[in-house]
């Protein structure tokens, strides 16, 4: 928990927007909160935490990266010219993994909260896990679910644990 009420309010205000559906709402990596916050865990353990939200690897069927049937071009801080959205998303995600993280959190799904089936997330899930393993970054996998205690959610976590030999919950 956070003891400083003002810091907690500021951190909450800096959370990214989210919405249902297929449209990508993240456009670039965002540090949340902007400055690391102190959290008290069980006992006397205190940690400083800051998350990084990024698009991640593209999922088949997602919307927002195309405009009039063509890949959207976006400006990034890494190039002096526009590049395709998918390329920017992958580049930003890789930079977050390699340059800005000490512990990774891969967020995937059992397919329960959107109209995209679980299978459409598998390539992106595999790619993220492979990147983290290749760099020997510690990480865990979270299965986002509308029904976290359901058999489907448990089976998704078990599949990931078995397939990748990693912790998933």
What label would you give each PLM region?
Residues 120-126:
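Charged helix-capping and loop-helix junction motifs
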Residues 46-50, 102-103, 138:
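Loop/turn-to-beta-strand initiation segments
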Residues 60-64, 115-119, 150-154:
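Conserved ATPase-coupling elements of RecA-like P-loop NTPase cores
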Residues 1-78:
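Conserved G1/Walker A P-loop phosphate-binding module
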Residues 127-140, 145-169:
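Canonical P-loop GTPase G-domain recognition
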């Amino acid at each position: 928990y956070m003891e400083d009420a003002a810091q907690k309010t500021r951190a909450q205000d800096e959370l990214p927007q989210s919405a249902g559906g297929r449209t990508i709402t993240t456009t670039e990596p965002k540090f949340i909160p902007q400055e690391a916050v102190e959290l008290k865990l069980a006992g006397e353990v205190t940690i400083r935490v800051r998350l990084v939200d990024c698009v991640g690897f593209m999922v088949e069927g997602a919307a927002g990266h195309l405009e009039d049937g063509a890949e959207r071009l976006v400006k990034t801080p890494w190039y002096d010219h526009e590049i395709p959205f998918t390329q920017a998303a992958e580049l930003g995600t890789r930079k977050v993994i390699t340059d800005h993280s000490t512990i990774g959190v891969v967020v995937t799904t059992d397919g329960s909260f959107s109209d995209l089936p679980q299978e459409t997330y598998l390539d992106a899930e595999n790619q993220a896990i492979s990147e983290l393993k290749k760099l020997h970054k510690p990480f865990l996998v979270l299965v986002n679910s509308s029904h976290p205690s359901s058999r489907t959610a448990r089976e998704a976590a078990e599949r990931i644990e078995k397939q990748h030999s990693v912790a998933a919950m």
